[in-house]
Amino acid sequence: MAWAISGLLVILGYLLGSIPTGYLMVRALKGIDIREQGSGSTGATNVLRTVGKTAAIAVLIIDMLKAMVAVGGVKLLYFGVPSAIVPLDWKPWLIVTVASAAILGHSKSIFLNFTGGKSVASSLGVLLVLNPLVALGALASFLFMLGITRIVSLSSITGAIAVNLLMLVLHQPLAYILFAILAGIYVIVRHKTNISRILQGTEPKIGQKLTEEAETV
C-alpha cells in the first residue's frame, strides 16, 4: 500500500508539473505556439517577450503554485494517513521525490512532447514549501546578482548555488540537501546555452531586444 500511494503521488506530481501554463496562456491570448517564438521555452521569460508582463507574471505564479501543490500534497498526506500505511521515515524522501517529479514535468512536459521551461519557477515553488527561509535566501541572491549584472540566466544560476549553501547552513535533512544538489545541477544544465554565451560575453541583459534576450524561467 505504501509503495502504491507513494508511486501515485510521484505520478501526480509529474502531471501537475507538466501542465504547460506558458503554452496554454500564449495559445489562449495570441493563438500561437510559444515553442515557435523566441527561445522556444514555455517559461515566464519567453511569455514576457511573446505576450507581455501581465501574462508572464501569471505564468510565473501558476508555475510556482503547481510545484507547491504537488509537494504540499505529500505533507497533507501525513496529516490524514496513519504512519502504519505510509512510514513516517519516508516523509522527507517522498517529499523530495515528488518535488523532483514536479520540476521534471515543468521542463519535460508529457503534454508537449517532453519540452517545457527551465524549471526555475517550479524550483522556487518547491523551496517555498520545503523551507521558506531557503527560498527567500535564494530569491535574495537572484535579485542581488540581477541588480549587479542585469543578466537573468546568471542570476538564476546564482540562486541555484545559494540554495545548496543555505541548505547546509540551516542544517536541513539529508534528503533536502541531496535534492538541492540534484535540482541545482539540473537547473544549471538547463542553462547550458546561456552559460556558453556568458563565457563568450554575448549573453543579453534585461532591456535588450526580445529576439536576443536569454530565456531562463
Swiss-Prot record:
Q: What would be the name of the gene that encodes this protein?
A: plsY
One molecular function GO term is: acyl-phosphate glycerol-3-phosphate acyltransferase activity
Any one of the GO BP annotations:
phospholipid biosynthetic process
Enzyme Commission identifier(s): 2.3.1.275
Any transmembrane segments, and where?
1-21, 54-74, 84-104, 126-146, 165-185
Catalyzed chemical reaction(s): an acyl phosphate + sn-glycerol 3-phosphate = a 1-acyl-sn-glycero-3-phosphate + phosphate
Q: Pathway membership of this protein?
A: Lipid metabolism; phospholipid metabolism
User: This chain belongs to which protein, by name?
Assistant: Glycerol-3-phosphate acyltransferase
Question: What is one term from the GO cellular component aspect held by the record?
Answer: plasma membrane
Instruction: Alphabetically list the UniProt keywords.
Output: Cell inner membrane, Cell membrane, Lipid biosynthesis, Lipid metabolism, Membrane, Phospholipid biosynthesis, Phospholipid metabolism, Transferase, Transmembrane, Transmembrane helix
Q: Give the record's membrane topology.
A: Multi-pass membrane protein
Pfam families, per the entry: G3P_acyltransf
Per UniProt, subunit arrangement is: Probably interacts with PlsX.
